[in-house]
């Protein structure tokens, strides 16, 4: 039975939604806590921003690639188990990153963090569909875990890093993930696997996927989404560093502007979604991408001209609007 049958089931469904949202927040906190600490990380390992950027690219790539097998693993082992693995591996990987002895270890453990965190979202969405009839609203609440993490994690990590060093700042991911893991394990009932005996090889079929991507409309949308995701991940990885090194802002102020980016990013998604219903998806995407062109261009121009905090904040606002492209 679903959540609208009895008060007990409704209570459990809302508990599940709250804990899934917290789990998503935990996986995001661990990844976003790294961004404001990049200057200190590069100084410790005596490497360039490009080297650390390569490690973070590996993290986001691993996050993307683990989305697909996560659904298969959920069908085989149950959603609860996979979500616990995602949150638990997030906590462990954050510890490994914090104690990394070299840039190679840092890179390897950030990839591990991305792979583990990526197991959560698809499986949690499937789990929530079993709890709610109005699944759209539930997914909307669940997705809110991302902006929540973006609002809180960067400034907190920056403050911790400024006082105790970047390694302690990285542990913010563990500090958040451990209690979420315990709460989820205690309050969520075991979920029965849907296909416990079917191997992953039987589930993976590349033929239909290839045929789907060969359609021009699908290929165009996929390419656009890929470019947008690339831009989002680049922003999530390096906006605080650019604000600190390019604009001369403090690490704390850079992290606060990074949080502002996430507030705008999350707050404008419902607006762009509604706008796409009124004027069309393509037109709305063009508007958001135009905001991005102006926003990113302004960030560079303001940095070169030394125009100060207010124009910088305005450019960050435009970048936040641009990254709401996913809603249409």
What are these regions (language model features)?
Residues 279-328:
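C-terminal transmembrane helical hairpin of 12-TM major facilitator-type secondary transporters
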Residues 76-87, 277-290:
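Cytoplasmic membrane-interface "Motif A"-like loop-to-helix N-cap segments
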Residues 46, 78, 96-104, 133, ...:
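Helix-breaking motifs and short loop linkers at transmembrane-helix boundaries and internal kinks
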Residues 65-104:
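Conserved MFS/SLC helix-loop-helix module at the cytosolic interface between two early adjacent transmembrane helices
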Residues 142-192:
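Helix-loop-helix hairpin linking two adjacent transmembrane segments in secondary transporters
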Residues 107-148:
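Cytoplasmic helix-loop-helix junction between adjacent transmembrane helices
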Residues 35, 215-267:
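Extracytoplasmic gate region of multi-pass secondary transporters
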Residues 185-207:
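Flexible cytoplasmic inter-helical loops of multi-pass small-molecule transporters
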